[in-house]
Amino acid sequence: QYYYRFGKLLIVDPDTADYVFNFQSKYDVRIVPPKQEGDHVERGLELLKELFLNGYSDRVKQELFPYALILADTIENTFTDQYVNMYTADRYIAFLVNDQMLNRTEKDKEKLSREWNNTFLNYSMDKAGWVVPEKFYLYSETEYAKKENWWIPIEGATEKDTADINIVWERGYPTGNWTYYYDDTWTNKIWGYAVSSSREGYLEKFFEFLFTAPQETINKAIVDHEKLRNAHDVLDQALKDDFGIDYRTMIYEAKD
């Protein structure tokens, strides 16, 4: 039904023809098909719908989804030697739906939904050529790379301090990494926030912010800080216009 509706594949029980999608160890990934016994596949499909598919319009599925979605019992990134919950490639996205995933708590399902959707939106930018409007960005690529823009020193701060994140938000950045650099003498540590140093990084961190921060935190941040609010509103509208989604409601909500 998925194929006839959107002209794309939803692979749950691969045959020989599907091995082009890596149900073997090659191309830096190894995918093991899901178990076919009992209601495992049906539960996997339901998990995919609830945590991911239901958040997107038919237009997005038709225009931006890859050629194939794959359900898997194991996804191993053989390049990094890590097992992952999701893997994106030019022509497919694989989702992990093994017993451990199917038996996650409601709160863990909510976290997984955020992870899957965040990964997909970054995939859409990288693989499908989606471009956020120019006015989303604070600076040109060259300006983002300047240290005075990506480094926010906090005078007198120490490692034990957790400096006010409002300082980062006021600059228009959604997140910052609390770290240090040495002064010109290479003897004294200067603590502060390191923020995105490129346009790509800025967009990635904004997605991370939208899909990991509590909504009340996002609301407070954009109400109090104009630069952050402007970027947020541009991205928010672009997601609605181009994906037909509202990030506030697309994520799976825990039932307990």
Residue locations for each model-derived region?
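First exposed extracellular module after export/assembly in secreted or surface-exposed proteins
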Residues: 2-256
